[in-house]
Amino acid sequence: MIAHGLPIYVALEPVDMRLGSERLGALVRDRMRAEPRSRALFVFVGKRGHSMKVLTWDGTGVIVVHKKLDAGRFELPCATQPGEQHLLVSDAMFDVIHKGVAITPRNARRRVH
């Protein structure tokens, strides 16, 4: 279903998962400065972190895929520049994100001397 080799843009700010294809498309235009009907995947995560929507266009229509984790949360990569609202990620990074795998170790602690 999700085609590999397409550009994958991940929104860094959480979105309301009640949004449908039209409103998600508007976010793609406004926040990502991209065209929703381009050959790309646009990834959005909900405020609680357990839901994800992927918007894409297959050449004949818009597709919205909604995934909800049974346990855990989707973890997004950090912005690389101040004020950045989205990131272009690799297929491998998208695989990590959409499976709900932690990007940063949760039990890592700083040592205090």
Role assignments for model-derived ranges:
Residues 1-113:
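Polybasic/polar functional segments that serve as interface/processing modules
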